[in-house]
Amino acid sequence: MQTSETGSDTGSTVTLQTSVASQAAVPTQVVQQVPVQQQVQQVQTVQQVQHVYPAQVQYVEGSDTVYTNGAIRTTTYPYTETQMYSQNTGGNYFDTQGSSAQVTTVVSSHSMVGTGGIQMGVTGGQLISSSGGTYLIGNSMENSGHSVTHTTRASPATIEMAIETLQKSDGLSTHRSSLLNSHLQWLLDNYETAEGVSLPRSTLYDHYLRHCQEHKLDPVNAASFGKLIRSIFMGLRTRRLGTRGNSKYHYYGIRVKPDSPLNRLQEDMQYMAMRQQPMQQKQRYKPMQKVDGVADGFTGSGQQTGTSVEQTVIAQSQHHQQFLDASRALPEFGEVEISSLPDGTTFEDIKSLQSLYREHCEAILDVVVNLQFSLIEKLWQTFWRYSPSTPTDGTTITESSNLSEIESRLPKAKLITLCKHESILKWMCNCDHGMYQALVEILIPDVLRPIPSALTQAIRNFAKSLEGWLSNAMNNIPQRMIQTKVAAVSAFAQTLRRYTSLNHLAQAARAVLQNTSQINQMLNDLNRVDFANVQEQASWVCQCDDNMVQRLETDFKMTLQQQSTLEQWAAWLDNVMMQALKPYEGRPSFPKAARQFLLKWSFYSSMVIRDLTLRSAASFGSFHLIRLLYDEYMFYLVEHRVAQATGETPIAVMGEFGDLNAVSPGNLDKDEGSEVESEMDEELDDSSEPQAKREKTELSQAFPVGCMQPVLETGVQPSLLNPIHSEHIVTSTQTIRQCSATGNTYTAV
């Protein structure tokens, strides 16, 4: 605002300018003062103006002169640029909250047109321009034809206006008004407006009561809380949603922010409700679409109970689906390459097996998209013609019509015969790898994106049950087929466990990387580390180039100093991996070199952590957390890079040693032509180490980094242990080695 005064009797001229950041073509109004003699009959003594009047608004400036709204003449100076604000014919509105020494310019209602062509209609609103910024304060837009989507935090003026409104309507005291400021900030931090979504009013109030309880604040009543929400989030509408007799009022147009901790609270409450649900009710859920012709057989009576618990689970499932990538589809399955038919089978039987298995995999994908994991066990039992040896209650798993239909297309006897053929085994293994990779990308499309804790726990429970479900469903199938199928599903389960753990670490580390004080402490502690000594000790094992290690150290410190986001760190790790493996691209030794890089990365990072531990670094906990995250994410990157280089899926790469019969010295030497392995073989042959120690070294190279993680979580399962091979029995010692996909186990005899 600029104020110029003259000594004339006609008074001074007050120039009001509305300054809007990055806005063009705003008309400037020059308000001229009218002589005092013309105002005598219009003067009214007003101590304080509390409300906005459309016909009579006064400026009180100083203690002598009073100007009335009706006697002010205005002149508009238009700009030549395109006008972004066009004046309506409505009356002018002025803010009178400021002191006499400060005048705030208020522009009347406008039709705002953004440069992007997005219109925002505001009826009865105000544009307030002050030294703190430009704010839009408007009334409720219940019947407005336009909608305003708030994507940023409301202005301080909006918060003050909301508190003032509650003070007038409810007579709040000054102490209560100060408490409202924290309540309003909590609302703005955890909620946002959005189109097409709604939240129950009771849910919002429950969240508010919990917040007040945790912070020992006095809550307002539900009615005042409703006014508070409407004053902050303008444009909210109220709808009554739900079935007859069980409907509730909802705020339409508001949702919990994706990064709000209320998401985890809400999911945990829904998960507990699901855990308390009776088992017979859980089995009544059926997919949104009839799957593989067996959905009706799993629904019991097929009737909805209408209980609130079921509605909670259904709502939870629908809410979780927004975190999935339902656009994924099954890849095309290749043809069965078979030269000679097994006895008693025809090519029609093979085609029937292909079509049935395709339908079976599509059914699995459908129930996973709908988060009905328990139905997968029934689908497996149906396809493999599960027949329990001792029926418990005389009930059947599926309807006889469904089984008879599948039996008519491919009898079980022929299915068992085909399962013994090597070509069928290989074809079905490839199909499983493609299907499981699609399921992983559906459930966890982005390992760094936050996932609700209830969904994470459901996925981990699902992964824990997979092997048992499949083994039980294939009780009458040839053992070779069972081993092939279990190896693939084990790789799938292990991938789900790893990715959910990686996601959990990512969310924990995200908070650390956003904390400025922790970042500064980490930098100070890292600068005290003697990297020359670390490199000297690690060089004997890693044999890394000194210049490359020094460059990584510099880049790491610079990235940390810039307070990079988690996504920027992920890009940095990907660049490190690409640079390290670039010399091996297009060579047969690439998978082996990738595994060696993982080992070297893990060893070098452990040396840095050791130095921080010995120095009692204050930020040791933060470094330990991000070290775990970076190791896991580097494993994730290498896994996908090897899959890309070999033309396979990451599930197939991880399941390479999942087939336990394949773990033999002959298969471990399949990269015999690679330079890396040849050098290691020569060093082992020339060494004078005992045979048992050399064999231990060879076998340990076959397993990727992190293979012991499932062992730490669930232990080695007996069903995954290899039959004892004679070549693993060392006659000079009393040790028998048993190898599994999850690590090495030694049993003394």
UniProtKB/Swiss-Prot annotation:
Molecular functions per Gene Ontology: DNA-binding transcription factor activity, RNA polymerase II-specific; RNA polymerase II cis-regulatory region sequence-specific DNA binding; transcription cis-regulatory region binding
Span list, region Disordered: 663-699
Localization (cell): Nucleus
Source domain of life: Eukaryota
DNA-binding region listed in the record: 183-258
GO biological process, one term: cell differentiation
Record key words, sorted: Developmental protein, Differentiation, DNA-binding, Nucleus, Repressor, Transcription, Transcription regulation
Feature: compositional bias, Acidic residues: 674-688
Listed GO CC annotations: extracellular region; nucleus
Entry-linked InterPro entries: DNA-bd_RFX, RFX-like, RFX1_trans_act, WH-like_DNA-bd_sf, WH_DNA-bd_sf
Major localization class: nucleus
Family: Belongs to the RFX family.
Job of this protein: Transcription factor required for ciliogenesis and islet cell differentiation during endocrine pancreas development. Essential for the differentiation of nodal monocilia and left-right asymmetry specification during embryogenesis. Required for the biogenesis of motile cilia by governing growth and beating efficiency of motile cells. Also required for ciliated ependymal cell differentiation. Regulates the expression of genes involved in ciliary assembly (DYNC2LI1, FOXJ1 and BBS4) and genes involved in ciliary motility (DNAH11, DNAH9 and DNAH5).
Assembly notes: Heterodimer; heterodimerizes with RFX1 and RFX2, and RFX6.
UniProt-recorded name of the protein: Transcription factor RFX3
Annotated source species: Macaca fascicularis (Crab-eating macaque)
